[in-house]
Amino acid sequence: MKNLLLTFLVVTIVCLDLGYTLICHQRHGLQTCEPAQKFCFAQTVMPFPNHPLTLMGCTYSCPTEKNAVCCSTDKCNR
């Protein structure tokens, strides 16, 4: 009986997702961040005149540019 309970406990621990990972918007859909990536970002860049491009996704640290948005909750960078 003890072996059965121990086996059940081990299987339960292995099957649980013990780590939390952040989910951020990216250009097309959602991205599950790596465990060390604690922030979502959105930043508009202008690669060509009059053609803005918004970059979105996970990041390790917040961008310092004035046109960047940084946040730390799921799907917050929309």
Curated annotation (Swiss-Prot):
Site (Key residue for inhibition of muscle alpha-1-beta-1-delta-epsilon (CHRNA1-CHRNB1-CHRND-CHRNE) and important for inhibition of neuronal alpha-3-beta-2/CHRNA3-CHRNB2 nAChR): M46
Tissue specificity of this protein: Expressed by the venom gland.
Gene3D superfamilies: CD59 (2.10.60.10)
Disulphide-bonded residues: C24-C40, C33-C58, C62-C70, C71-C76
Primary location recorded for the protein, binned into one broad class: secreted
Places the protein is found: Secreted
Site (Key residue for inhibition of muscle alpha-1-beta-1-delta-epsilon (CHRNA1-CHRNB1-CHRND-CHRNE) nAChR): T44
Keywords from the named record: Acetylcholine receptor inhibiting toxin, Disulfide bond, Ion channel impairing toxin, Neurotoxin, Postsynaptic neurotoxin, Secreted, Signal, Toxin
TM region(s), chain numbering: none
Site, as annotated: Important residue for inhibition of muscle alpha-1-beta-1-delta-epsilon and neuronal alpha-3-beta-2/CHRNA3-CHRNB2 nAChR: H28
A GO MF term: toxin activity
Site (Key residue for inhibition of muscle alpha-1-beta-1-delta-epsilon (CHRNA1-CHRNB1-CHRND-CHRNE) and important residue for inhibition of neuronal alpha-3-beta-2/CHRNA3-CHRNB2 nAChR): F48
Record-marked site positions (Important residue for inhibition of muscle alpha-1-beta-1-delta-epsilon (CHRNA1-CHRNB1-CHRND-CHRNE) and neuronal alpha-3-beta-2/CHRNA3-CHRNB2 nAChR): H51, K66
Key word Flavoprotein present: no
Protein name: Short neurotoxin OH-26
